[in-house]
């Protein structure tokens, strides 16, 4: 029977964690002590130092030779049951998908054991429960988070193949991933070079695109180009290594540059005199267009009649060409469409380089559509200009991404990218851009995947590159190795090293909760995914997870306090690491965010209810 003293002991252990979280929340939302940049620095410290050292402290001080294998087996069986059920649902039903499989698996089986579980379970069931929680933490860090990464990278590899090789994926026999590609999460533009070997099979090389590399070296200029910038090969046309004489010849000048100001000055409404910086959030599309000086000999209209071109090309062939000159009739067509569009309309520039001679009109249906303004082809270089309105377009796109600039980030991006990819026929030097797909990873069910061994090797390479950059990987492995050595030969850690670690690990628990409070304060809404989806997520977290754990525990033979500890541990709030992965790979991040934030708020009363009911 649970007494009031037992409840007070639990509250004594848990309430201080919530105090740290509330202080952090108030520091941002109420008192405005920390700016978002400062919050980012604190979170960085917690992620790199505090939490890894906290993990190392708990793992290295836990005796691995005294593990309760029955308890560990029950925890493992719970996760295997959920994984098998979700895999069957995803593959055998129409509503199933890989994304929902990953999300439900994260919600139901991966709780916040390190930060919340250890102090809570120690207060409820004693120090032995804390030792069991450490065993769960070891398995989470080494096995289950790695499996989660594997699933996310499998999704990324599947999307890559579906986008780039929709009909020839089964012919791929090898992938070579260049060293600067860390993940297939879609944050970087990627290129694929496919070479046909002597056996007629495809050998694919995956690398970062030139645009992605250049973007790391440039400070992008804030722009009002909303969602259309996603498709530009650079985030801004203002800074580049473009040949300025070519640029001026296109604009109608007979010679090279006529002054010491560049394209950034021309298209910015800010003065170039003095140290005034270029970035501005002024709506330049709504302002008066300032063009070049009048030139009577020019056969091209004034520069103010059409916007600045994007002077950067993505080349897959190594051949350079000059930009295409625009015929008068197409310029008039641009002017007419610009006058008809609303003042919020944006123009999308797409420069596509292809070794194929197929015209752009083959992709865009002859160019007679409302969106296509101009198209030319000179030595394989094609320019596509598309007027993109801020108003949402009617489309059959499925959900799975935010609507940016009137284009659904799932279907709209794939639609345009498939068009550009269609310009490049499959050959020995074909290249294509990989853009991050939306939340829905479903697609062409007829797409054939490469052999399992090829896919597995690609995914393992990417998972390995992610793991070796994660401090928690090192802290967990080193802590486990030290525990195996220390408890086998009774070796003590040197005092200097022990104190150096403990001074930071002691702050790890409070800093982790403080960081969580900062994260909550920076979110626009506590429930970001809608009430119905949030209710479903909470039901999976606090009902389905403990129920499956009870079934697994009884099947293994747990009883008494061991079974109670297993069930309460499964009812802890959502773990933070699955949310971080969901954010990186853009797979239902709002659901995991709600699971972390709202779950943390309601976790204490729910775990207390489980504690009281199981103690009856």
Swiss-Prot record:
* Compartments in which it is found: Cell membrane
User: What upregulates it?
Assistant: Down-regulated by endoplasmic reticulum stress treatment.
InterPro entries membership? Auxin_eff_plant (IPR014024), Auxin_Efflux_Carrier (IPR051107), Mem_transp_PIN-like (IPR004776)
Give the GO cellular component terms, alphabetically. cell periphery; mitochondrion; plasma membrane
What residues form the membrane-spanning segments? 8-28, 39-59, 71-91, 102-122, 132-152, 477-497, 501-521, 536-556, 562-582, 596-616
Q: Which residues lie on this side of the membrane: Extracellular?
A: 1-7, 60-70, 123-131, 498-500, 557-561
Q: Which GO terms describe its molecular function?
A: auxin efflux transmembrane transporter activity; identical protein binding; protein homodimerization activity
Q: Where does (indol-3-yl)acetate bind?
A: 51, 112, 114, 145, 576-577
Q: What residue ranges lie in the Cytoplasmic compartment?
A: 29-38, 92-101, 153-476, 522-535, 583-595
Classify the protein's membrane topology as the record does.
Multi-pass membrane protein
Family assignment from sequence similarity: Belongs to the auxin efflux carrier (TC 2.A.69.1) family.
Q: What is this protein's function?
A: Acts as a component of the auxin efflux carrier. Plays a role in generating a sink for auxin into columella cells. Maintains the endogenous auxin gradient, which is essential for correct root patterning. Involved in EXO70A3-regulated gravitropic responses in columella cells and in root system architecture (RSA). Together with PIN3 and PIN7, involved in the connective auxin transport (CAT) that ensures communication across the shoot system, and modulates strigolactone-mediated shoot branching control.
The protein's name is Auxin efflux carrier component 4
């Amino acid at each position: 029977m649970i007494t009031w003293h037992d409840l007070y002991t639990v509250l004594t252990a848990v309430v201080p964690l919530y105090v740290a979280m509330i202080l952090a929340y108030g520091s941002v939302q109420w008192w405005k002590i920390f700016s978002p940049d400062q919050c980012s620095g604190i979170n960085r410290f917690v992620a790199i130092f505090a939490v890894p050292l906290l993990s190392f402290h708990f793992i290295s001080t836990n005796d691995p030779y005294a593990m309760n294998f029955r308890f560990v087996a029950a925890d493992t069986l719970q996760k295997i049951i959920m994984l098998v059920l979700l895999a069957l649902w995803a593959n055998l039903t129409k509503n199933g998908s890989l994304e929902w499989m990953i999300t439900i698996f994260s919600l139901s089986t991966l709780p916040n054991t390190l930060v919340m579980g250890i102090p809570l379970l120690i207060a409820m069931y004693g120090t032995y429960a804390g030792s069991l929680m450490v065993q769960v933490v070891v398995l989470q860090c080494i096995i289950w988070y790695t499996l989660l990464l594997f699933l996310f990278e499998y999704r990324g590899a599947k999307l890559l193949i579906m986008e780039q090789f929709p009909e020839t994926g089964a012919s791929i026999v090898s992938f070579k991933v260049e060293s600067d590609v860390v993940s297939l999460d879609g944050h970087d533009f990627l290129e694929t070079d496919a070479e046909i070997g002597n056996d007629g099979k495809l050998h694919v090389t995956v690398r970062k695109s030139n645009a992605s590399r250049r973007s790391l070296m440039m400070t992008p200029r804030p722009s009002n180009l909303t969602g259309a910038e996603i498709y530009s090969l650079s985030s801004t046309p203002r800074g580049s290594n473009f040949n300025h004489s070519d640029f001026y010849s296109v604009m109608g000048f007979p010679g090279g540059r006529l002054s010491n100001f560049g394209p950034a000055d021309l298209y910015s409404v800010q003065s170039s005199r003095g140290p005034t910086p270029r970035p501005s959030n002024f709506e330049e599309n709504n302002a008066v267009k300032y063009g070049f000086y009048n030139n009577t000999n020019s056969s091209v209209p004034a520069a103010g009649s059409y916007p600045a071109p994007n002077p950067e090309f993505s080349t897959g062939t190594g051949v350079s060409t000059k930009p295409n000159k625009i015929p008068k009739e197409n310029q008039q067509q641009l002017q007419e469409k610009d006058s008809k569009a609303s003042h919020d309309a944006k123009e999308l520039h797409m420069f596509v380089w292809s070794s194929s001679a197929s015209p752009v009109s083959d992709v865009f249906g002859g160019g007679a559509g409302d969106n296509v303004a101009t198209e030319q082809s000179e030595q394989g270089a094609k320019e596509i200009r598309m007027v993109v309105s801020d108003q949402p377009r009617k489309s059959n796109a499925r959900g799975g991404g935010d609507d940016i600039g009137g284009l659904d980030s799932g279907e709209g991006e794939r639609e345009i990218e498939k068009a550009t990819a269609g310009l490049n026929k499959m050959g020995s030097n074909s290249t294509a851009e990989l853009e991050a797909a939306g939340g829905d990873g479903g697609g062409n069910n007829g797409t054939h995947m490469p052999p399992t061994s090829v896919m597995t090797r690609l995914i393992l390479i990417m998972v390995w590159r992610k793991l070796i950059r994660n401090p928690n990987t090192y802290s967990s492995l080193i802590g486990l190795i030290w525990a195996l050595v220390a408890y086998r030969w009774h070796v003590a850690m040197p005092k200097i090293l022990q104190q150096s670690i403990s001074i930071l690990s002691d702050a790890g628990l409070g800093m982790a909760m403080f960081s969580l409070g900062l994260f909550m304060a920076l979110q626009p809404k506590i429930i970001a995914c809608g009430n119905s989806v949030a209710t479903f997520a909470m039901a999976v977290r606090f009902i389905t997870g403990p129920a499956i754990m009870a079934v697994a525990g009884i099947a293994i033979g747990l009883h008494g306090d061991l079974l109670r500890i297993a069930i309460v541990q499964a009812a802890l709030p959502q773990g933070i690491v699955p949310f971080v992965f969901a954010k990186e790979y853009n797979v239902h991040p709002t659901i995991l965010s709600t699971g972390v934030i709202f779950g943390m708020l309601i976790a204490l009363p729910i775990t207390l209810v489980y504690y009281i009911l199981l103690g009856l």
